[in-house]
């Protein structure tokens, strides 16, 4: 049994905004330290950014506003940008070290999970609006906004479609928050921390990506943990794990693109 939401779900809009701001930080500073939280809904987008990057420059603030409105439309923006905590910054002063305590798990994807991921992308390609999908053995449930029953029935005639009828969805119907759809992003690999709105020094990003990729490659579960400040994980220098995660983020098009669908 698995649930998947698409990139226009309010929670994913929040993740995408957070990812876009992380992308901007990487444009203005090599390997910035950044954490972004987004709460969006009903015409307002609240954003808090903790960062080492110079994002208070007028051109950077404009770029953040432009990214938010590109993703979420015309919306009131409440933006707070503050420096990273000095103790946390000192942890990374001499190279990459784990940015927090954490537990991590990578689990090979099941055929059911791969199937639903493909279905979600297929529907979203035709209907790029808020949607949520569930697959439980042979039972497929499709809740897709801004589409009629007949539209979806043509694609998936045996599915349960919009059980309460047609709907509009989006951030004027439901609020969105960063890292609230980790089951959709990570399947059975969910543990403690979220993937989005963070730089690569954060173990929640790099170790989660590393564990997931290793599980898919080996076909075996992977379980890891770290303490803040660790410089070795799974017998590898943490810097090497960061570079594996960096390559994955780059391969999908950046942090905003990564936030669209998560790990699969």
Label the predicted regions:
Residues 1-264:
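A domain-level signal for the structural core that forms small-molecule/cofactor-binding pockets
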């Amino acid at each position: 049994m698995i649930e998947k939401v698409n990139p226009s779900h309010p929670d994913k809009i929040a993740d995408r905004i957070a990812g876009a701001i992380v992308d901007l930080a990487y444009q203005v500073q090599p390997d910035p330290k950044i954490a972004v939280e987004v709460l969006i809904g009903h015409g307002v987008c609240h954003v808090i950014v903790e960062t080492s990057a110079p994002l208070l420059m007028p051109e950077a603030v404009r770029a953040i506003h432009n990214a938010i409105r590109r993703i979420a439309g015309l919306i009131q923006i409440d933006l707070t940008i503050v420096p990273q905590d000095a103790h946390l910054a000192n942890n990374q002063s001499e190279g990459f070290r784990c940015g927090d305590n954490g537990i991590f798990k990578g689990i090979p994807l099941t055929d059911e999970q791969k199937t639903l991921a493909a279905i979600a992308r297929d529907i979203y390609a035709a209907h790029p609006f808020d949607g949520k999908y569930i697959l439980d053995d042979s039972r497929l449930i499709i809740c897709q906004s801004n589409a009629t029953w007949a539209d979806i029935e043509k694609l998936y005639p045996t599915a349960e479609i919009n059980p309460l009828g047609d709907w509009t969805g989006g951030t004027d119907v439901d609020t969105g928050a960063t890292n609230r759809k980790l089951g959709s992003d990570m399947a059975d690999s969910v543990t403690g921390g979220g993937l989005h709105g963070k730089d690569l020094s954060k173990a929640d990003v790099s170790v989660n990506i590393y564990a997931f990729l290793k599980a898919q490659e080996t076909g075996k579960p992977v379980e890891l943990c770290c303490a803040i400040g660790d410089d070795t994980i799974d017998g590898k220098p943490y810097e090497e794990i960061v570079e594996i995660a960096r390559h994955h983020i780059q391969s999908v098009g950046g942090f905003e693109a990564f936030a669209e669908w998560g790990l699969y």
